[in-house]
């Protein structure tokens, strides 16, 4: 492992020199003077070097490509963090392609047999050794099960884990170094960025997780005319092997074939938007890697086109609170109610509670007013979210991984929709959906569901009160962090008092002694006083 790490260090150093990345680093304004002086003294900087006629973004992209698949995927993720990177670098990194030569089919067969505990011919009536596709983490082979179903077999590359561990370790070293030497770099939270990437890449190595994601998404859209997700064959899925139904669709970027079958492009673009908002707000579970390579269009019913989604390795979800704040933010934003947008960011905890709402409102207005001078159909929903996040970052907005995934997915969906139908008015499609969703949040059915959830909290009420009293009785209690239930964005005061009333009502209804009421009223008063402190 140490030898591998040392070799990777030498490789990184050679790539840095080849693409003059040291020049880019030394030009960073956040770099302290002593590190700039140290960098200027590096030995290779005194040697004659040919001039590179490349932009800084192109140099970084080529360097990441040279460093291999793990750095390529890191660059792809960085390209979605436009709240952190300049546009020219983010645009260049978006061109990174996660395509690498396939590994030998003999190794694929060996890994499949090891994972399934059976010979390949015992499981498959046919197995195509030439892969359909190959990427940095896995490659895909076509096959037919003994039972006759046409399937694809996804298999993780062998000997990948040691390389990933080594590369991730170096990324962490570089991120920690950046945080240590520059306060400006600390503001960008590079360690958190690498940590998010580590989670993403580790999750992609577990194909059982991807299978579960695909099953969930398929169930959410069962029978839907909007989206089809291939079936997972669980009997043949393992951590490093995934077997799914093979689909035959048209790549969404193959516009010529879609035209030949007379696809309704307007309906196709609008359905993409509807799928996104359905996943985010109805299901709170969304496919977060919907780039064109993972999206196909069914050949059936081109006048009512249906999407087909594959590769569910990366998904996102939102809490009820995040859903609510996001919907209200978007509606307020398009009504140009910047005060409400600023207040919602503070109320949600996305920016610190001590943020001055007037200053935040003014910053949002300055960034967003020029956007709204365009016709609504020309406004990019994804860019709106991006500018909002960039502004919020200046006010110390904490990284919200789920919102970053959502913004990236929205940019993909919107870009795809405009490619299919340039006149797409995303807001016209989204607004009715959001307003309907907000109305359903206060419908009798939803209120009853919320009421039932309140009842479920009743058994924990007395324990919560005891825990709070015990915490406050401890030395330095006022400096301790609040309990998780108190720091939640819910209005716990209202909930607890409501729960007390429910308990009393339940006791009366069950014929319990009415003398229990004073105790509950006292508890309510005590909790009220505690929470008011």
Swiss-Prot record:
It is an enzyme of class 2 (transferase). Pfam families: ABC1. The chain crosses the membrane at residues 24-44, 510-530. The keyword Cell membrane applies. Its EC number is 2.7.-.-. It is found in: Cell inner membrane. It comes from the Bacteria. Is probably a protein kinase regulator of UbiI activity which is involved in aerobic coenzyme Q (ubiquinone) biosynthesis. Belongs to the ABC1 family. UbiB subfamily. This is Probable protein kinase UbiB. It comes from Pseudomonas paraeruginosa (strain DSM 24068 / PA7) (Pseudomonas aeruginosa (strain PA7)).
